[in-house]
Regions:
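Conserved GNAT-fold acetyl-CoA-binding loop/helix
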Residues: 60-82
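Conserved active-site alpha-helix within GNAT-family acetyltransferase domains
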Residues: 144, 156, 168-186
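Conserved GNAT acetyl-CoA-binding A-motif
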Residues: 154-165
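A short helix-loop-beta-strand connector motif used in the catalytic cores of GNAT acetyltransferases and
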Residues: 81-96, 127
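Conserved N-terminal entry element of GNAT/NAT acetyltransferase domains
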Residues: 3-5, 17, 21-50
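Conserved beta-strand-loop-alpha-helix junction that forms the acyl-donor binding cleft
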Residues: 163-173, 190-193
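Conserved acetyl-CoA-binding loop-helix of GNAT-fold acetyltransferases
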Residues: 130-133, 139-152, 175-179
């Protein structure tokens, strides 16, 4: 049986460069004792979409490799187009981290609201969809700077909190988020048929 991303996803293997470009998703890689530099975080612009596409390919490749029936192979060009569209949406936050003018990470999040119902109260959160840091800048404060900036945006938007999910395989990311005060509150299970 073909893997789902082979059958249903637009993919370009040439864009799946991953660690060859010195990139790693949150929770992976090491800083190798490098000196922490000043990290500047700013909202991404249309001029940043190619860099976002390259960084996104790393996150996507990790997930596609780990769960090929659930995640498509990376396509940096398509990801750049995706981010170009997202940047125009008022409920979307895309942040870029830079050190010395070099792109070293990004965060993509979306404001989500739930009305109160019989079972659950009203909720307004910033859902963190993706975060990625260059592997050569891991443990250098990039991820922390991105998450801090996201939290500041959530506060300025009057949201109740931030929410995210991470793959059960990604223990490094889980430890990173725990170090920032994130706690597990839900476990999703799946059975493939």
């Amino acid at each position: 049986m073909p893997r789902r991303h082979d059958r249903n996803c637009a993919a370009n293997a040439d864009t799946a460069r991953g660690h060859q470009n010195g990139l790693a998703p949150a929770g992976e890689g090491a800083n190798n004792g490098r000196v922490t530099r000043s990290v500047a975080v700013r909202p991404a612009t249309a001029a940043d979409v190619v860099a976002l596409g390259r960084l996104n390919a790393v996150v996507q490749e990790l997930h596609a490799r780990t769960h090929p029936t659930e995640f498509c192979a990376p396509d940096a060009t398509a990801a750049a187009s995706f981010f170009r569209e997202k940047l125009d949406q008022p409920n979307v936050l895309v942040l870029l981290a830079e050190e010395g003018g070099r792109t070293v990470g990004y965060l993509y999040a979306e404001e989500q609201h739930r009305e109160a119902n019989l079972f659950r109260p009203r909720s307004s959160v910033l859902e963190i969809h993706q975060i990625c840091t260059r592997s050569d800048r891991r443990r250098g404060g990039v991820g922390r700077a991105l998450m801090t900036a996201a939290e500041q945006h959530a506060v300025s938007w009057g949201l109740d909190g931030l929410r995210l999910s991470t793959g059960s395989f990604n223990t490094d990311a889980q430890q990173f988020f725990a170090s920032l005060g994130y706690v597990p509150y839900s476990i999703r299970l799946m059975r493939r048929l």
